[in-house]
Amino acid sequence: MARETEFNDKSPSSTDDGMSQSHFSDKLKNLFHFRRNRAATVSTSVRNDQRDNDSDDSTFDINVNQLNELDLNDSSDQLDSRPSLRRVSSAPDSHKGVEAPPPRPLINMSNIRKAQVKILKNPGNYIFGRTEYGKRTYSGNSTKISRVEVTPHSFEKIRLLGQGDVGKVYLVRQKSNHRLFAMKILNKREMIKRHKVNRVLAEQEILTKSKHPFIVTLYHSFQSRDYLYLCMEYCAGGEFFRALHSLPKHILPEKDACFYAAEVTAALEYLHLMGFIYRDLKPENILLHQSGHIMLSDFDLSKPISIVTHPTVVLPKHSTFSQEKPALDTNSYFSNFRTNSFVGTEEYIAPEVIRSCGHTVAVDWWTLGIFIYEILYGTTPFKGKNRHATFSNILYSDVSFPEYHGAPNVSSTCKSLIRRLLVKDESKRCGSVAGASDIKQHPFFRHIQWALLRSMKPPIIPKIEDGMEAVEPSDNDNEEEDFLNSQYLISANLPAVDMHSSTPVNEQSNPFDSFSSVTLHHAGDE
């Protein structure tokens, strides 16, 4: 949940959750002034995370049509007078004027005694949602959805894993079987206030439908009067971001970067085939399973399409790269589909998003290029001294690669893929012809056996003793309010609305009516 930055171009007439761009611009036009007349502005907001506890929900007007090199030295640029958006991989808290905290160790056995965790003779059989990676079949009929079988009282809270502006994530243990889960608890009042109801509904839809080894698994979802609960697989390896920053220079050798890029590509391909644009790829949103394989998480910025078409096949002669077999066209699902939402992470945002001209599934391939660059070089390619400069670089600067003495050794083949993924024109970007098939056919992945990714040994294996990560109880007694003291909705048969409102319940609309309270059984987990 670290370094989480969100931009929102909100339009009441669109299917995305939020307010109109012009409304924000009119309301905030006196806050910031640039020397030049602006042709167009976009609104941005800061989404806080566990390392940014400011509750400031500030918005900004920033010029995207007149960014140029002269603007980078413009002393009238007032953006830096506001809280900086998070996106400095080496110092995520630099905007606060404090030293970035060191990466949390993957294992700290001294804290286990604090948690008073009972380690049984064979803890792997009961601690994790999956006892052995790859045991699940992921077949189309491997998931059984039934009426929810748990309540908040079915779990014991161990500690707080992270928090955002509308909720928290806890490490919990199910009392009946001692299995560990990550439970996301979202405050309904805050979601309504911040116009994020549709986002959690989209996230639940993705988690409920997904059956993929590189996407985090949902086991239970339910709600109380005041909160929504998503009980998901606990990835004991933690954030990929933290694992990366525990390495020398915070980088990976090219061979290892290729492995993780391949797993991310496979996960994105699956999401696209399911009709979802991810839109927020970054190391913080990638978790490490205890086996070392990756799992994508945090789908609240993802965009589902309303109508999913049948897939098509691209013949070899039409493919971007030479290949022996026809390629499955994952782009065909998004034919004639564009969305105007302004969402993402500052240094990962694609040019078409900044220009507010609408975007397609191609934004995911842009973020893949940024991701590969970052894990190879320890920084992102277009990062500027401030947000204004970063956006200018994204729009107008070509990607460059460090060539100083001691710079990471990266092959021309790898650089070729990064350049192809970071083409400004989305219609010419790698992936524009057949989607994921284009990326998978690039020579950079020539040694990857895509069907056997789950069987490959990951470069980073989390050091977890006795099946446990460092676990310790939280010292904040107020956290019990959202965990146990909420009135359980299903058993009490209460409406999913704000019970504290002065408006009678029968007159309130129910924005959470489509939030499904279900339990999912996965073949291979029992």
UniProtKB/Swiss-Prot annotation:
Query: Mind naming one GO cellular-component term on file for this protein?
Result: plasma membrane
The active site annotation covers 280
Entry binding sites for ATP: 161-169, 184
The GO molecular function terms of this record are:
ATP binding; protein serine kinase activity; protein serine/threonine kinase activity
Query: Which terms does the UniProt entry file under GO BP?
Result: phospholipid translocation; response to pheromone triggering conjugation with cellular fusion; signaling
- For this protein, the Enzyme Commission number is 2.7.11.1
Q: Which Gene3D superfamilies match?
A: Phosphorylase Kinase, domain 1 (3.30.200.20), Transferase(Phosphotransferase) domain 1 (1.10.510.10)
Identify residues that carry Phosphoserine.
Answer: 154, 341
- Annotated coiled-coil positions are none
Q: Which reaction does it catalyse?
A: L-seryl-[protein] + ATP = O-phospho-L-seryl-[protein] + ADP + H(+); L-threonyl-[protein] + ATP = O-phospho-L-threonyl-[protein] + ADP + H(+)
Q: Which PANTHER family match?
A: FLIPPASE KINASE 1-RELATED
Q: Say which family it is in.
A: Belongs to the protein kinase superfamily. AGC Ser/Thr protein kinase family.
**By what name is this protein known?**
Serine/threonine-protein kinase ppk22
Q: Which species is the source of this protein?
A: Schizosaccharomyces pombe (strain 972 / ATCC 24843)
Which gene codes for it?
A: ppk22
